[in-house]
Regions:
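Catalytic domains of carbohydrate-active enzymes, especially glycoside hydrolases
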Residues: 1-4
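Active-site gating/metal-coordination segments in enzymes
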Residues: 8-96, 100-103, 156
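Short alpha-helical
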Residues: 11, 41, 129-130, 156-157, ...
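Catalytic pocket-lining loop regions of alpha/beta-barrel enzymes
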Residues: 56-57, 70-175
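Conserved, mostly hydrophobic/aromatic
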Residues: 20, 50, 58, 81, ...
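Conserved hydrophobic residues forming the short capping helix/wall of the S-adenosyl-L-methionine
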Residues: 24, 139, 196
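Mid-to-C-terminal alpha-helical segments outside catalytic/metal-binding sites
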Residues: 48, 168-175, 183-218
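Alpha-helical elements of Rossmann-like donor-binding domains used by nucleotide-donor carbohydrate transfer enzymes
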Residues: 19, 45, 49, 76, ...
Length: 218
């Protein structure tokens, strides 16, 4: 399992990373990403610290952090991640609370991907929770380094639409996610299995794509 810590404020980052990395070191079945805020002081030092621990990527959440991903102030984070060959995973789209400002729209992430084609970018919720028409328009043509996870989408998308969207993305760009504790992993996995995908497509989504992205042996 991959832990994705979320720091809402700049001041929360370092302590949260200390805690989640300690938890991962105590359980070899866990892989922990780092928390990050693109506007924080000491960003480079925090990324250096995570890199020294062997952390493969970081999580940001534009909606809670109130950050537009294509804001030029985010570019230093993206360049630092490219320089370290680290992954950026981000919440994309709306949330269940229907906040008036989305921040992380598919269009803005497409703009970011165009600015940083070498950035390994994983967009949660199949690229944009409850914004899948915009995902089709703006993110399906995005570069080969843009991936999509399946976390928490099953409450908002019909199975046939989910299957069709995965087919258009290409199963090789889709990574299983649950967004636990908001969705139980077992339930999320059963929904993927019920889509009628091939065994090779399921294997890619459940573990092969993630293992390749993380540089882990299959």
């Amino acid at each position: 399992s991959v832990l994705l810590p979320l720091a809402k404020g700049c001041q929360d980052v370092s302590a949260l990373n200390d805690w989640v990395q300690a938890a991962a070191r105590e359980n070899r079945e866990l892989t922990a990403f780092g928390a990050v805020h693109p506007f924080m002081d000491g960003l480079e030092q925090e990324l250096d610290r995570l890199e020294a621990w062997g952390v493969r990527g970081v999580k940001m959440m534009p909606l809670l952090q109130q950050v537009y991903p294509d804001d030029p102030q985010c570019f230093r984070l993206c360049q630092m991640l490219v320089d370290r060959d680290m992954i950026l995973i981000a919440h994309a789209g709306r949330d269940p609370l229907d906040r008036p400002e989305v921040y992380g729209t598919p269009e803005r992430f497409a703009s970011l991907a165009a600015s940083f084609p070498d950035l390994k970018l994983v967009l949660a919720h199949l690229g944009g929770l409850r914004m899948w028409d915009a995902v089709r328009r703006h993110l399906l043509p995005a570069g080969k380094n843009v991936f999509f996870d399946t976390a928490y989408v099953s409450f908002y998308i019909e199975r046939e639409e989910m299957k069709e969207l995965i087919a258009h993305m290409g199963p090789e760009r889709v990574i299983f996610g649950s967004d636990y504790p908001w969705e139980m992993p077992g339930r999320a996995a059963e929904i993927i299995r019920d889509l009628g995908l091939s065994r090779a497509e399921e294997d890619a989504i459940f573990f092969k794509n993630a293992a390749e992205l993380l540089g882990q042996p299959l």
